[in-house]
Structures are given as structure tokens and as C-alpha cells.
Design a protein with these regions (language model features):
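Beta-strand segments within the central parallel beta-sheet cores of soluble alpha/beta enzyme folds
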Residues: 1-6, 68-76, 109-116, 143-149, ...
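Conserved beta-ketoacyl condensing-enzyme motif
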Residues: 6-17, 108-124
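Conserved small-residue
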Residues: 18, 55, 73, 111, ...
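Stable alpha-helical structural segments in soluble proteins, enriched in small hydrophobic residues
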Residues: 96-104, 131, 135, 167, ...
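Conserved beta-strand-centric core segments of catalytic alpha/beta enzyme folds
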Residues: 1-61, 159-225
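Condensing-enzyme catalytic core mediating Claisen C-C bond formation in acyl metabolism
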Residues: 29-104, 113
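Acidic-glycine-rich active-site phosphate/pyrophosphate-binding loop
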Residues: 19-33, 69, 126-145, 192-196
Length: 225
């Protein structure tokens, strides 16, 4: 089974729609630093384009044919809070993460790394940070979090696919990818953000979040095999 996503919406309609919602960064004079998840000076996301696909296969079948196994997709969670078309709430993301943990048979403290949705919007980054702290409690300070959208921008329908690939590679390489462009972390984003440089660490289990406009939330849990 192939699972992933792709999207290419850098066009007048795509950009115009998100601009009319005031979702995009206006840092046009400094585009390389415009996408800055969790930074106090973030002002919206930068649209990107791309794709990411994973090959999903039953474990024994993959072993029998000698496939290279990167990790196990052990849990998923979905929720729809329908709170507001653009303004998020914490209950939907919390439920999505809880469901993924339950499906994987893990506790919050079992997660070593979180690849966040982290779009660089003023409200969204704070909301996700609060949801993470609500679920993970004291473990939040140990949980390493990064948003790779600082480097890629927001791929919209392609974001979950490519960021799942990043999460799988983090487990393979035992390295948390950095969140770039975080100069001054917003104190309201009270999570342990991996900033600037990759962080070599043990990653036994990792979580991937994607939270869409309208309150559509999805979470995956991957584990080292």
C-alpha cells in the first residue's frame, strides 16, 4: 500500500484565498526567514509544494521478501472539532493524539520526538503547544519537538506525507530535524523546540501531527523496529 499526499497550489487562486484569510506571512522582503514556527515574530505561513509517500506493508510479508524496514506505523488518531474555520481549539488535537497513543498501546511518556504541525501562524502554533502540554504534562519538557515547515513551508495536502517521511527518517537516523528560523521562541509556545541544528538522540517512538483548517486533526505514531 502506498500512503501519502501531494499538492501544488502556488497559483493566483491558492495564494489569493489564503491571503484573504490573513494566513500568509507578509515578510516579502526576507522570504528565506519568513516561515518561523514557534518564533515570537512569526506572522503566517509560507506556501510550499511537494509530495511524500510511504510504502506500508504487513511486517511478516516485508520480512519474507527481505524488504528494508524503516520503522513500524503503530498508531493513528483522527478527530474533527469543527470549532472554527480558521481559529483552532485544543480539544480536537488532544483527542487526536490520545487516540493515536491508545491505538499504538503507548503512554505519553513513551514518545521521544514529535514532528509538529507548526505552520508559523500566530494562533495555530500556540494552540498546538498548549495541546501538547495538556496531553504530555511534565513529559513535555523532555519531549523534543520540531516543525520542518520552517524549511519547506506549508505543503497543505502534501504536508502530512512529506513530514511523515521526515519523521520516519528521524527514527532511522536517530536524529531530530531542527526548526529553522527560531530566533526568539514565543514564551506562549511552551514546548521543547529543537532549534537551529539537528539533535542526535534516541528515538524509540515518534509522533506526527497535522491539524487542518476547520478542525480536521490527524496524528500518527511510528516506532523503531
Amino acid at each position: 500500500m502506498l500512503a501519502g499526499g501531494t499538492e501544488g497550489t502556488i497559483c493566483p487562486v491558492g495564494i489569493g484565498g489564503f491571503d484573504s484569510m490573513h494566513a500568509l506571512s507578509r515578510r516579502n522582503d526576507d522570504p528565506a526567514h519568513a516561515s518561523r514556527p514557534f518564533d515570537v515574530d512569526r506572522d503566517g505561513f509560507v506556501m510550499g509544494e511537494g509530495a511524500g509517500l510511504l510504502v506500508l506493508e504487513e511486517y511478516e510479508h516485508a520480512k519474507a521478501r527481505g524488504a528494508k524496514i524503516y520503522c513500524e506505523l503503530s498508531g493513528y488518531g483522527l478527530s474533527g472539532d469543527a470549532y472554527h474555520i480558521t481559529t483552532p481549539a485544543t480539544d480536537g488535537p488532544v483527542r487526536s493524539m490520545q487516540m493515536a497513543l491508545k491505538h499504538a498501546g503507548l503512554k505519553p511518556e513513551d514518545i521521544d520526538y514529535l514532528n509538529a504541525h507548526g505552520t508559523s501562524t500566530s494562533v495555530g502554533d500556540v494552540n498546538e503547544s498548549k495541546a501538547v502540554r495538556e496531553l504530555f504534562g511534565e513529559h513535555t519538557d523532555k519531549l523534543v519537538v520540531s516543525s520542518t515547515k520552517g524549511a519547506t513551508g506549508h505543503l497543505l495536502g502534501g504536508a502530512g506525507g512529506i513530514e511523515s517521511v521526515f519523521t520516519v527518517l528521524a527514527i532511522r537516523d536517530q536524529v531530530a530535524p531542527p526548526t529553522i528560523n527560531v530566533v526568539n521562541q514565543d514564551p506562549e509556545c511552551c514546548i521543547n523546540v529543537c532549534k537551529g541544528e539537528p539533535q542526535k538522540m534516541e528515538i524509540r517512538a515518534a509522533m506526527k501531527n497535522n491539524f487542518g483548517f476547520g478542525g480536521t486533526n490527524a496524528t500518527l505514531v511510528f516506532q523503531r523496529v
